Amino acid sequence: MELLGRYINGNFKTTILSDGTKIRETEDDEFLPTFAENMDIKICNFCDMGCPFCHEGSTTDGKFGDILNEKFINTLHPYQEVALGGGDATSHPDLIPFLQKLKDRKVIVNMTVNQIHFEKKQELIRRLVDEKLIYGLGVSLVNPTEKFIELIKKYPNAVIHVINGVLKPSDVEALENNNLKMLILGYKHLRRGDDFYS
């Protein structure tokens, strides 16, 4: 397990390890940060999937955010964590230069992708992980095939996102006994997700 970094944020010291472990220490009774430890950033509203349950409402007409904005990037602190998503974050034309800027600032990046994009864009995903442009990878599960299970095992910091109400219990059972990390998320009644549920 590799040390990613240590930093002081307000009245506490934080240590972050390569497996995602985070240790916070303070001599006080409460943690009082001076800046956000992590943030979610939706970098685009473009996606070619059109999943009926998607709460993001992203479409093929969706726009790409101005992620190379230096004014924003310069507000980020070393070892601050950002979770990138979209739409399809992997489709953003400035993704690699943006991630390189964040890496240069020692910002720790996690990214969420749809299972279909994860499988189709393996060359890009592998590059992002191998070059340490991202550390954590969230993959929104669509169909737990054997191919998917074997593929995701190659990413030690991958977490499978299971959306309650979208998948069947048998889909979750298919993941059992594979030594995989799983996060069960609540269903969001927003945008297309609201129509799908009703």
What is each of the regions a protein language model found here?
Residues 46-47, 75-78:
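C-terminal capping segment of individual leucine-rich repeats
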